[in-house]
Amino acid sequence: VTEERLDTGAADRIVGSIVDSTGISRAKTFPAHMLSWFVEVGAGASPSWAVFCVDDHLAFTPSLSVTGDLRLRIDRDRLRRIGDGIRWAPAGLYDQNGTRSSLCTRGVLERVVDALAGIGVQARIGHEVEFTLVGGHGEWAAYGLGAVLGQDEFVADLLRAAAGAGLGIEQIHAEAGAQQFELSLSPTDPVGSADDLVLARILIGRTARAHGMRASFSPVPVAGGSGNGAHVHVSFTRDGRPLLSGGAGPHGMTDAGGSVVAGILRALPGLGAVLTGSVLSHLRLRPGMWAGAWCCWGLENREAAVRLCALTPGNPHGAHLEVKPVDPSANPYLACAAILGAAHAGLVGALPLPAEVPVDPVRLTDAERAALGVDLLPTSPDDLLAALASSRLAGDLFGPSLREALLAVKSYEFGEFRARPPAELAERFRFAWTT
């Protein structure tokens, strides 16, 4: 392998990372002159990386234990400067012969994108990033001008870091919780969007530390407080034509667009362990939290799991869906794969669009919700695990080894922590997903 020197100093380095089954980024670092090695050969990584839990326990399975070895190889085309002589790139997991491992979550998303392309459909995804600054001070008001200006130096440095890393940020504002921010990333291809989400969290974490703070990406950083979401905005086209506008269906949806919505709604109950599967997630995924706890869809309905953002002059990116239940404990590659895989299943099955729910579902009677087929998404550990184990879609998307790893990790975490008080869990895991 030819070593390659970058235009950097001797102490400069390259960090390559993956995201594991519990949503935590795991990484290895090479000196900058070893770039080609990191790309072509990679760093050693035990298959046990797939069964790391949120507390670093290893939830070994019959097929994933202390034996074997994989290679962590970075995607050179995604190499980005993150400051202080550090470049970062997303990595994939490969076996010793150079074949993509079935445990590689980035590879799972790539396969789903290819499956959509096989039926002529392309997707674009943009992520919302919610986080809470711990150690910040000052008065706070949701969407408050004073709240943003009070952290103006942090915001300015974050935007500079993003520009230097080639990360598109479209807006940033103060959120409902004290010292809570939300920023929106520019939409792009699905794999690139997940890479961008990981990069955004890196830059947010580094910038917060530089200002004497820490950024929490926990679903519930403070018990009883506002939760952090990770809403996923996704649009679909076929042969260049949008599926969610220009049709004769509700709000301009095409029949295919209706099938996308139907596929996602049908799949969501079986994918909760992937999208909202931390020991804190159930504290956020509740009615009244704008977290999409109800399994239904509606135009600009922020209590629905799937919010339709229709094509209007105020929506320059075009019609798209916001999948609201997802929280920051989710692996972004698996979350995007789950959503796109569900959409693919809806399209292949030509599923009909369910009835719209145009109001907050909590305002409906039990009988009205039953007539519309509206129910809360599962949040109990037993329900989440059983749904993941029995979901045909999850099996098709993730394969036996990765699903086995997911079930092992979530089973351990729920068993170990489900009885702990919310305040204890919020404090213990406040920075578990911080980079």
What annotation goes with each model-predicted range?
Residues A27, A91, G227, A343-L351:
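Glycine-centered structural positions embedded in regular secondary structure
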Residues I14-G16, L183, V306, V323:
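Short beta-strand motif preference
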